[in-house]
Design a protein with these regions (language model features):
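Gly/Gly-Pro-rich "capping" loops immediately C-terminal to redox-active cysteine motifs
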Residues: 35-36, 42, 61-127, 144-175
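The canonical Cys-X-X-Cys-His
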Residues: 49-60, 197
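Hydrophobic, aromatic-enriched interface-forming segments
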Residues: 125-141
Length: 216
């Protein structure tokens, strides 16, 4: 039953954004680091996700107690990563209901459990897509939320991590992104945060897969 649900969920992620994916098809994907055996990186990815992404996006197929597979104790998970649940066995869902999110945003933001698998294509892995996407936001005054993205043009999602990265602008002549206002992190530090976050999203799609691979 769970496998059928996950299959339907994956298909929804694959086909719902087809137009947007086509719009960004010509953009080169940067290679994401493979961090599936790096528990410290995945722990940091969980921290970034909970603090910056989980106001809108959940990982509903992952229960909080699965985070102990990353080397965290249950107490560490409860103290530092559980802000929308009461029990360690609860799914990692957002606190707001889908109907409320639809009212606020026009559509409920998608659950991200399987996003890394759904974004895989002939152009690169889902991790590559996410790693590029989360580093490709730029200021665009023409957009309702003030942001745009070179990989996913006219995306409705704002840049949730802009305080860390800073503000990028798109050069009208070269179509390259350049830093206009520095953020809290250097470029290298921000890239590392995103790599860790993407690593966590890859792990969420199949918890434990990377560790099993390392064990042979």
């Amino acid at each position: 039953m769970k496998a059928d649900i996950m299959k339907k969920f994956l298909l929804a992620l694959l086909f719902a954004p087809a137009i947007a994916l086509g719009a960004g098809a010509a953009v080169h994907l940067d290679k994401a680091p493979d961090l599936q055996g790096d528990k410290a990186a995945l722990q940091n990815g969980a921290r970034v996700f909970v603090n910056y992404c989980m106001n809108c996006h959940g990982l509903s197929f992952v229960r909080y107690n699965r985070l102990t597979e990353l080397g965290l104790s249950e107490q560490q998970v409860m103290d530092n990563l559980m802000f929308t649940a009461d029990k360690i066995g609860d799914p990692m869902r957002v606190a707001a209901r889908a109907a409320e999110q639809k009212q606020w945003f026009g559509a409920a933001p998608p659950d991200l459990t399987l996003v890394a698998r759904a974004r895989a294509s002939a152009d690169g892995s889902g991790a590559d897509w996410l790693y590029t996407y989360l580093r490709s936001f730029y200021r665009d005054e023409k957009r309702p939320n003030g942001w745009n993205n070179t990989l996913f043009p006219n995306v409705a999602m704002p840049h949730a991590l802009w305080e860390l990265q800073g503000e990028l602008v798109l050069d009208a002549e070269t179509h390259a992104l350049k830093l206009a206002t520095p953020g809290q992190l250097s470029v290298a530090e921000y890239d590392k945060e995103i790599a860790d976050l993407v690593g966590l999203l890859v792990w969420a799609g199949e918890p434990g897969a990377g560790f099993r691979k390392n064990l042979g």
